[in-house]
């Protein structure tokens, strides 16, 4: 979609056009190849920031660990991770002092969540490090594999139980002397193809059992796999992100639940709210500071940037915070919450795929896996890589690097926000005991600081004090990248504030366009995005109308569904023309069937099928909305579906759109080429799982099969349900006596087989 940006800004004040300077149009940069280098950078940097800490060795895994807590305070502006425990605890105490009962209440809320959360919570999320296969898998598969291994090792894991019970298993697994796992491996054979008589490589997948001793198992349980963060705009260098395994995930979830509950009660926290709610929260803080400073005081705002937030945070500090926050709570609760930070203090970073070497002269390519980096001769590497490897070598164990200090990206966003807010909270006059005071906003590593004082010297003193207070808890405000302005103009989490928030429309640009799900969903998502931007982002009526026309054009080109009376020739035009000619009411045809577009900015909230229903020929209605149409594999379609739209920064966000099920709501079938790869075993497991779930849903039509049915197993539940249904059908005359007898016989046989097993 080409839009000339100047058209959008003819009548826009200059400050509103700031968003056009953002790197948001066009494709974002993606990373290729291995993330090993980026991960080594992270590990080395993190250790450098804490280098004056104390070294110890983990007695269980033998991993060398660096502990910077209560280490020497930095003399200058260098970023450092030497947080002081007593300062953090005092900041927590002051935070509680200004918000009486906040920790107590959040603990009670969290306790309730802990007792109710089921283990299927862990199936949410995308790629997860699967410790049994030592690589990433979809979350649901990784959980299933973990539970399977736990079971075969005598733990009571149950995929429909409470998450807390699963976590007890995790704790027990760490005490076991060994764990037996099932791994997939590939065999390659050279064989002659009968047809072509050429030699080909055949791959077969085997499953084999493998025993892990306690040390190896602990290393895997504490491992975070690393990948390169994709699609980051406005950066020259890529960076590494981490994905933890199933052992850590559940514990992190509960800690974040507690921290989220605290953040919700803090007016300075930019999390967990978003969008307009966040803007309102921010506007309140600004209003408070402006109102108080009108006559006598100056008010300045810093658009803040912290240096390497994650790499200077420390899990040991989080442990201290949790210990304080939960101090009057029952022992079991305190234990559950303290495990996540303890695991993170002992974490291992997996270095990823390793390096690829190719020799131009001999046309050879070879992969050096991360496991070999500890022993390989360094003459093969260039100078910068050589330095990285030399530095990281003392930390390596089995292809993972011991990484005790620092938090990997995105793990404890909420809890680190609580820490940031606790420093903002210290800016009240009753704490500063002087003429300056501050307040601000914190959202993970992003902050805005508003300082009020009678004169410029006071402002400077306030900023200095804030800066030094942050240093005490391991937060490093970057003097180079933060800038100060009269209050009224600042930026926070890509919201631009200029006497009110300016709509940063360019951030939404990437979500305009055709999503590529299917014809039905794409139409619905496209118009919903335009509607939402009219509501939230100052998208004016003329621009919205233009966006709509561009969208329809884009949509028609994507699905080759130009109007039936067009001259454009595509693969589909023959069929669509035929349909156009035999349709009486042409306005009733959907755009994807070559019909005209009836959308305008007034009716974007109506699904296209509903908009055109009255205009459709009767037989077209019958074909379009026919659940028995053999060409469709229908999902159960809720009245509202969720699409993932990509804003220009931050995670992909979920957006609701109206879903009307038609024959255009198809689901593409899986690519077959997976069958020849090492994923095949997993695919078979997935299909098995899918079949069981489908079968279960046939018995319980309204069921979401993730919920357990009482205490009985799936099979028992299905058998008893089959019996009840059969009896009802027999008594109402829907089935004959013979059929009824046969069903009863099958049910009996199944139960017998179960007993024998």
Swiss-Prot record:
Subunit relationships: Influenza RNA polymerase is composed of three subunits: PB1, PB2 and PA. Interacts (via N-terminus) with PA (via C-terminus). Interacts (via C-terminus) with PB2 (via N-terminus); this interaction is essential for transcription initiation.
Return the EC number: 2.7.7.48
Renumbered residue ranges of the record's region Disordered: 53-82
What is the protein name stated in its UniProt record?
Answer: RNA-directed RNA polymerase catalytic subunit
Q: Which reaction does it catalyse?
A: RNA(n) + a ribonucleoside 5'-triphosphate = RNA(n+1) + diphosphate
Q: Which residues cross the membrane?
A: none
Matching entries from InterPro entries are given as:
RNA-dir_pol_NSvirus, RNA_pol_PB1_influenza
Molecular function as annotated in GO: nucleotide binding; RNA binding; RNA-directed RNA polymerase activity
Q: Where is the RdRp catalytic domain?
A: 286-483
Question: One of this protein's GO BP terms?
Answer: viral RNA genome replication
Q: Which residue ranges have biased composition labelled Polar residues? A: 55-64
Q: Which GO terms describe its cellular component?
A: host cell cytoplasm; host cell nucleus
**Which keywords label this protein?**
Eukaryotic host gene expression shutoff by virus, Eukaryotic host transcription shutoff by virus, Host cytoplasm, Host gene expression shutoff by virus, Host nucleus, Host-virus interaction, Inhibition of host RNA polymerase II by virus, Nucleotide-binding, Nucleotidyltransferase, Phosphoprotein, RNA-directed RNA polymerase, Transferase, Viral RNA replication, Viral transcription
Protein family per UniProt? Belongs to the influenza viruses polymerase PB1 family.
A matching Pfam family? Flu_PB1
HAMAP family hit by this protein: INFV_RDRP
Q: Where is this region: Promoter-binding site?
A: 249-256
Q: Where in the cell is it found?
A: Host nucleus; Host cytoplasm
Q: Where is this motif: Nuclear localization signal?
A: 187-195, 203-216
Q: What does this protein do?
A: RNA-dependent RNA polymerase which is responsible for replication and transcription of virus RNA segments. The transcription of viral mRNAs occurs by a unique mechanism called cap-snatching. 5' methylated caps of cellular mRNAs are cleaved after 10-13 nucleotides by PA. In turn, these short capped RNAs are used as primers by PB1 for transcription of viral mRNAs. During virus replication, PB1 initiates RNA synthesis and copy vRNA into complementary RNA (cRNA) which in turn serves as a template for the production of more vRNAs.
| PTM remark | Phosphorylated by host PRKCA.
């Amino acid at each position: 979609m080409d839009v000339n940006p100047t058209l959008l800004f003819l009548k826009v004040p200059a400050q509103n056009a700031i968003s056009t300077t953002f790197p948001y149009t066009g494709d974002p940069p993606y990373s290729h190849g291995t993330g090993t280098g980026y991960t080594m950078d992270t590990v080395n940097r993190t250790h450098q920031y804490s280098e004056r800490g104390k070294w110890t060795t983990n007695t269980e895994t033998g991993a060398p660990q660096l502990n910077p807590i209560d280490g020497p305070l930095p003399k200058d502006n260098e970023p450092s991770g030497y947080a002081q425990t007593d300062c953090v605890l005092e900041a927590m105490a002051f935070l509680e002092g200004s918000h009486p009962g906040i920790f107590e209440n959040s603990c009670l809320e969290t306790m309730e969540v802990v007792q109710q959360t089921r283990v299927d919570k862990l199936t949410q999320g995308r790629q997860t490090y699967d410790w049994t296969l030592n690589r990433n898998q979809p979350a649901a598969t990784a959980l299933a594999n973990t539970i399977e291994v736990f079971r075969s090792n005598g733990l009571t894991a149950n995929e429909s139980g409470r998450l807390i019970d699963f976590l007890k298993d995790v704790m027990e697994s760490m005490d076991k002397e060994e764990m037996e796992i099932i791994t997939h491996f590939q065999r390659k054979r050279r064989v002659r193809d009968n047809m072509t008589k050429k030699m080909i490589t055949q791959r077969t997948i085997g499953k084999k059992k493998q025993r892990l001793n306690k040390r190896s198992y602990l290393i895997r349980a504490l491992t975070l796999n690393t990948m390169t963060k994709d699609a980051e705009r406005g950066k020259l260098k890529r960076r590494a992100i981490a994905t933890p395994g199933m052992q850590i995930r559940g514990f992190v979830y509960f800690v974040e639940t507690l921290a989220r509950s605290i953040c919700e009660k803090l007016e300075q926290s930019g999390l967990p709210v978003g969008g307009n709610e966040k803007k309102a929260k921010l506007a309140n803080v600004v209003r408070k500071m402006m109102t108080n400073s009108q006559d006598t005081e100056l008010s300045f705002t810093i658009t803040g940037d912290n240096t390497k937030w994650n790499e200077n945070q420390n899990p040991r500090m989080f442990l201290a915070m949790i210990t304080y926050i939960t101090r009057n709570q029952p022992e079991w609760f305190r234990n559950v919450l303290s495990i996540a930070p303890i695991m993170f203090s002992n974490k291992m970073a997996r270095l990823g795929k390793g390096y690829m070497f190719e020799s131009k002269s001999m046309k050879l390519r070879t992969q050096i896996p991360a496991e070999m980096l500890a022993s390989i001769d360094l003459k093969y590497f260039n100078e910068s890589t050589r330095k990285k490897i030399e530095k990281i070598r003392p930390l390596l164990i089995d292809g993972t690097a011991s990484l005790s200090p620092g938090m990997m990206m995105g793990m404890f966003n909420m809890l680190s926000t609580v820490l940031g807010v606790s420093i903002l909270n210290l800016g009240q006059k009753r704490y500063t005991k002087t003429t300056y005071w501050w307040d601000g906003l914190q959202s993970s590593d992003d902050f805005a600081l508003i300082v009020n004082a009678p004169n410029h010297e006071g402002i400077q003193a306030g900023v200095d004090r804030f800066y030094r207070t942050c240093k005490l808890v391991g937060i490093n405000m970057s003097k180079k990248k933060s800038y100060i302005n009269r209050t009224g103009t600042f930026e926070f989490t890509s919201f631009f504030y200029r006497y009110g928030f300016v709509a940063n429309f360019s951030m939404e640009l990437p979500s305009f366009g055709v999503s590529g799900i299917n014809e039905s969903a794409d139409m619905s998502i496209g118009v919903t995005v335009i509607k939402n931007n009219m509501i939230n982002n100052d998208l004016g009526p003329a621009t919205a109308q233009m966006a709509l026309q561009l969208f329809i054009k884009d949509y028609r080109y994507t699905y080759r569904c130009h109007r039936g009376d067009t001259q454009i020739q595509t693969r589909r035009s023959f069929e669509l023309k035929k349909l156009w000619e035999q349709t009486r009411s042409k306005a009733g045809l959907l755009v994807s069937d070559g019909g005209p577009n009836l959308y305008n900015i007034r009716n974007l909230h109506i699904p296209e099928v509903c908009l055109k229903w009255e205009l459709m020929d009767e037989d077209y209605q019958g074909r379009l909305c026919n659940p028995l149409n053999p060409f469709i594999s229908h999902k159960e379609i809720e009245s509202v579906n969720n699409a993932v739209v990509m804003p220009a920064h931050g995670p992909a966000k979920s957006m609701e759109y109206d879903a009307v099920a038609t024959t255009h709501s198809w689901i593409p079938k899986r690519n077959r080429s997976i069958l020849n790869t090492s994923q095949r075993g997993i695919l078979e497991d997935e299909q098995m799982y899918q079949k069981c779930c489908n079968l279960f849903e046939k018995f319980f039509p309204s069921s979401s099969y993730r919920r357990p049915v009482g205490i009985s197993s799936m099979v028992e539940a299905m058998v008893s349900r089959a019996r009840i249904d059969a009896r009802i059908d027999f008594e109402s005359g829907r089935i004959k006596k013979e059929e009824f007898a046969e069903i009863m016989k099958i049910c009996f046989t199944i139960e017998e087989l179960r007993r024998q097993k």
